[in-house]
Regions:
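Conserved catalytic cores of soluble enzyme domains
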Residues: 1-107
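Intrinsically disordered, low-complexity segments enriched in small/flexible residues
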Residues: 95-137
Length: 137
């Protein structure tokens, strides 16, 4: 994915309720641009995996509003982890993908901004459960 960006932008589209987790979330993070819809979810681990490891009191995978407030498309866009927030509409997604191809490569690719993301992680207070507003800071 990173090597392809020498030639043209690589655009990830994350749509629908299944989510983009694990290796696919890493692949999305390497793309030139990440486009998400309202139903999209993006994270290294899925809600069930986090619940299994942390416990249901910490992370209830059945609490859909809670899950989407942390990993949903709107949240990922608002927190800067996605470049566009789109309607779940095929024509809008198609138009946006073409627009991002036409835009060309970003001045500083996401894969070259690791220090920025590490700084953001370092600023988190791990003693407290994150909420939607805290994730956007």
């Amino acid at each position: 994915i990173v090597d392809l960006q020498r030639y043209q932008p690589v655009v990830a589209v994350i749509a629908g309720p299944v989510g983009c987790f694990g290796g696919m979330s890493i692949a999305a993070g390497l793309c030139s641009y990440v486009l998400v819809t309202r139903e999209a979810r993006l994270g290294l681990n899925g809600p069930q995996v986090i619940e299994q490891e942390a416990g249901i009191a910490e992370y209830d995978s059945r609490d859909r509003p809670f899950i989407w407030s942390l990993t949903g498309g709107e949240q990922r866009f608002a927190s800067g982890l996605a470049d566009a927030y789109l309607a779940d509409d095929l024509d809008e997604v198609r138009t946006s993908v073409l627009a991002y191809f036409a835009k060309g490569l970003p001045a500083r690719p996401r894969c070259r901004r690791a220090e920025d993301y590490l700084r953001r992680l370092g600023d988190l207070d791990t003693a407290e459960q994150p909420d939607a507003a805290g994730v956007r800071r």
